[in-house]
Amino acid sequence: MKEIIHICFSDSAIGSVKYAIKKGVMEGEKVIGLVDDLSNGPIDDIANMNRRIYWFKKIYIEEGNEISEIIKSYYKKIIKDIMKFKDEDIYLWYGNSAKEICGMLHILSMLEEKIQNVYTINVSEITYNTGKKNEYTPRVVGELIPEKLGEFIGRRKSMDFERYSSLMALWDKLKRENSNLRVYEDNQVKSAHIDYFDDMILCYTCKKFMHSVRTIGEVIGKAESYVSDTFIFWRVTELIRSEKISHRGNLGFMRELEIKKNNR
């Protein structure tokens, strides 16, 4: 039986898959990951990290310099790991989110010579508690407990040239458009304007001061398209600069910031 390498696209997904393997929920020789959130920022020249790093420092308000070094190290490691691939089966884990699909597309672009060994696993293919109040469909791998991951192995999809070409055509299109935001909408990843979530942020911002984490949590939880708290926090600060939101407290720290919607 071939060895299995799992590839994930967030720290939480990497941790969950490693835990599932450790507990015998599924098999795997190695778990590697790309944690750069390619749903936002420039993607037309990812190999040249300078523009991505400039973007990180812009939106990672609390940890721009630190996160830049972490993500650079992930890129170096995953490129090194891919160069060592031989005849292992490669499982790419993702959900219906721009973050994980864009990450998967970028990694797939590096695996052209290995597509006969590549399988994709989409965790959004199962809806849990159907018909109940707590019905949910995972948007990203990290929304699942590790014990459930084994259910998806039998649903893995093999990669053929036709499917690979279609996915690479999508990736080329997104890179040409090179928008600073990509979202999952109408069952596909598409380029979007940078203020895509702004109306939703304003909708969940009260007219009296409340902690910013409350607004950010509401947006993340209610948005159809998965989005990170980092990106929404950055948009909050942009709405403060444009005077649509007032603030008090430390503008540089999400948990120390209170916000309210301006009356206009």
Task: For every predicted segment, state its role.
Residues 240-250:
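A short, conserved structural fragment
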Residues 86-152:
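Internal, hydrophobic cores of structured domains that mediate oligomerization or house catalytic pockets
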Residues 250-264:
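Short, cationic-aromatic polyanion-contact patches
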Residues 233-237:
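Short, hydrophobic-biased segments on the C-terminal half of alpha helices
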Residues 135-210, 214:
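A conserved mid-domain beta-alpha-beta active-site/ligand-binding segment of alpha/beta enzyme cores
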Residues 61-105:
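Long, hydrophobic/aromatic-enriched structural stretches that serve as scaffold segments
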Residues 216-229:
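Short helix-coil junctions and helix-kink-helix linkers
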Residues 1-67:
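A structured, charge-rich N-terminal accessory region that forms the first stable segment of a protein
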